[in-house]
Amino acid sequence: MQEIFLCSISNVRSGDCKEDCAYCTQSSHHQGAIKRYKFKDEKVVLQEARALRELGALGFCLVTSGRELDDEKCEYIAKLAKAINQEELGLHLIACCGRADLDQLEFLRDAGIHSYNHNLETSQNFFPKICSTHTWEERFITCENALRAGLGLCSGGIFGLNESWEDRIEMLRALASLSPHTTPINFFIKNPVLPIDAETLSADEALECVLLAKEFLPNARLMAAGGREVVFKDNDKKEAKLFEYGINAVVLGDYLTTKGKAPKKDIERLLSYGLKMAASCH
């Protein structure tokens, strides 16, 4: 029976990002109707961690909006990591805080963070079409820094941004050179406040993307992330194929600014596919 790893997200700092990423509603350039706050209260984050662990989540990702880590964010994430680890929940803690240098990542590692998430998003060639305020190369360097710091690397991308199949191949080839332990696979969902005018991928094309990712990243944990709930909707037959084609992890619950599937119903559906929820990250 195939094991599926469940990971959950806490958006601990939301909105007001100065970057102009064309796919992200947290950018202040797009004026999306989202909640904006600086730092989520520690008690709320702990409640989320307990509740999601009880549902079976093994990974818990602390996400901050903004271009990069700074001293204030480092201290805040370190404080959250220590508090969560003191609960002895057995959660694998991931930080996702933008561009980061080696010293910052070593600081988070020593505070109890286990992995760092920083997505390449797309190919080096296509990236300037979706962001002008930082470079693809900066993203790649941060991924290298995470590995140098001894953290697990979680890095993936978004399919459906109007990129070509060659762009998809180039992104996956770059990811393969990093050997991430986990690769989130996101499917872009059109939003009227965002400048990208792209139709949602069909379930069949999304499955082709998963097959391609598996070909380039045979040893990575492929995680179905944003967009799964829209691309596959209630199409159980095609959603089940995700796991036949290489997906072995999913994001449980909500994303950064969009609703995911209801966790309990999502788990019931996964079980109906003949999948088993993993009991350990190792």
Swiss-Prot record:
GO molecular function annotations of the record: 2 iron, 2 sulfur cluster binding; 4 iron, 4 sulfur cluster binding; biotin synthase activity; iron ion binding
Reactions accelerated catalytically: (4R,5S)-dethiobiotin + (sulfur carrier)-SH + 2 reduced [2Fe-2S]-[ferredoxin] + 2 S-adenosyl-L-methionine = (sulfur carrier)-H + biotin + 2 5'-deoxyadenosine + 2 L-methionine + 2 oxidized [2Fe-2S]-[ferredoxin]
InterPro entries hit by this protein: Aldolase_TIM (IPR013785), BATS_dom (IPR010722), Biotin_synth/BioAB (IPR002684), Biotin_synthase (IPR024177), Elp3/MiaA/NifB-like_rSAM (IPR006638), rSAM (IPR007197)
Record-annotated Radical SAM core domain positions: 1-228
Keyword line: 2Fe-2S, 4Fe-4S, Biotin biosynthesis, Iron, Iron-sulfur, Metal-binding, S-adenosyl-L-methionine, Transferase
Residue numbers binding [2Fe-2S] cluster: 61, 96, 154, 221
EC number: 2.8.1.6
Cofactor(s) required for function per UniProt: [4Fe-4S] cluster; [2Fe-2S] cluster
Biochemical pathway: Cofactor biosynthesis; biotin biosynthesis; biotin from 7,8-diaminononanoate: step 2/2
SMART domains linked: BATS, Elp3
List of residues binding [4Fe-4S] cluster: 17, 21, 24
Co-factor: note: Binds 1 [4Fe-4S] cluster. The cluster is coordinated with 3 cysteines and an exchangeable S-adenosyl-L-methionine. Binds 1 [2Fe-2S] cluster. The cluster is coordinated with 3 cysteines and 1 arginine.
Disulfide bonds: none
GO biological process: biotin biosynthetic process
PANTHER family listed in its UniProt record: BIOTIN SYNTHASE, BIOTIN SYNTHASE, MITOCHONDRIAL
Job of this protein: Catalyzes the conversion of dethiobiotin (DTB) to biotin by the insertion of a sulfur atom into dethiobiotin via a radical-based mechanism.
Entry-linked HAMAP family: BioB (MF_01694)
NCBIfam families given in the database record: bioB (TIGR00433), PRK08508.1 (NF006308)
Subunit-structure text: Homodimer.
Assigned protein family: Belongs to the radical SAM superfamily. Biotin synthase family.
Protein name: Biotin synthase
Native source organism of the sequence: Helicobacter acinonychis (strain Sheeba)
Phylogenetic placement of the source organism: Bacteria, Pseudomonadati, Campylobacterota, Epsilonproteobacteria, Campylobacterales
